[in-house]
């Protein structure tokens, strides 16, 4: 199916955001908003979001990929994935405004873009959203961070000669020891929950 791509701009809390809308001649009733992950913009690594959008548009879906505030060509301060709900809501709005036949929107997100989509839907229960496609969502909790630090940092640190020298000479602070013990306990608690 043939489609047309066009640059679109829209306003979110006073800032102008930019995106690319790929729209087939006769779009399906459900459209897709691509939510990028990490510090990327609407093209994506190796043009992955361009290729994805074009493939979906050729299959009959209207697709909007856009830059959050502070990323790519969009204005405003840079956002983290847990602070882009307004951007996502505005993107859905412009998509439905530009393609009035669209009744529902599916959010497609990669990595922390997937987490942003999930958080958006959880926070808003937006009735316009009828689907989520979440690829590799990224979530960090205190317990998962502690487990990662114990596994990757502290294990390696115990093998370093200078650590043992600092410990033996009394240069390791009480705060560091307490932090290590707390993180080890958190990591152990998480491991017990997973088993």
Regions found by a protein language model. Give the residues of each.
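N-terminal cap/lid segment of alpha/beta-hydrolase-fold proteins
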Residues: 1-30
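Short, surface-exposed "cap/lid" segments of acyl-processing enzymes
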Residues: 24-67
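Alpha/beta-hydrolase active-site loop signature
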Residues: 39, 68-72, 139
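Catalytic nucleophile-loop/oxyanion-hole region of alpha/beta-hydrolase
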Residues: 71-104
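Short beta-strand immediately N-terminal to the catalytic nucleophile in serine-hydrolase-like folds
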Residues: 106-109, 135
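Gly/Ala-rich beta-loop-alpha elbow adjacent to hydrolase catalytic centers
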Residues: 108-117
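Active-site signature of alpha/beta-hydrolase-fold catalytic machinery across serine-
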Residues: 119-123
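The alpha/beta-hydrolase serine catalytic core
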Residues: 127-195
């Amino acid at each position: 199916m043939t489609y047309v791509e066009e640059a679109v701009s829209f306003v979110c809390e006073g800032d102008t955001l930019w995106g690319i809308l790929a729209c087939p001649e006769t779009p399906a009733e459900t459209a897709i908003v691509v939510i990028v992950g990490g510090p990327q913009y609407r093209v994506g690594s190796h043009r992955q979001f361009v290729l994805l959008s074009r493939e979906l548009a050729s299959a009959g879906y209207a697709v909007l990929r856009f830059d959050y505030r502070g990323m790519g060509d969009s204005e405003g301060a840079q956002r983290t994935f847990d602070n882009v709900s307004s951007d996502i809501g505005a993107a859905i709005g412009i998509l439905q405004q530009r393609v009035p036949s669209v009744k529902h929107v599916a959010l497609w997100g990669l990595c922390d873009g997937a987490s942003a989509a999930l958080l958006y839907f959880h926070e808003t229960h937006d009735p316009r959203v009828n689907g989520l496609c979440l690829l590799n969502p990224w979530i960090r909790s205190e317990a998962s961070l502690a487990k990662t630090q114990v596994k990757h940092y502290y294990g390696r640190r115990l093998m370093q000669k200078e650590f043992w020298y600092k410990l033996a000479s009394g240069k390791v602070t009480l705060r560091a020891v307490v932090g290590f013990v707390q993180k080890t306990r958190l990591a152990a608690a998480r491991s017990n929950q997973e088993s």
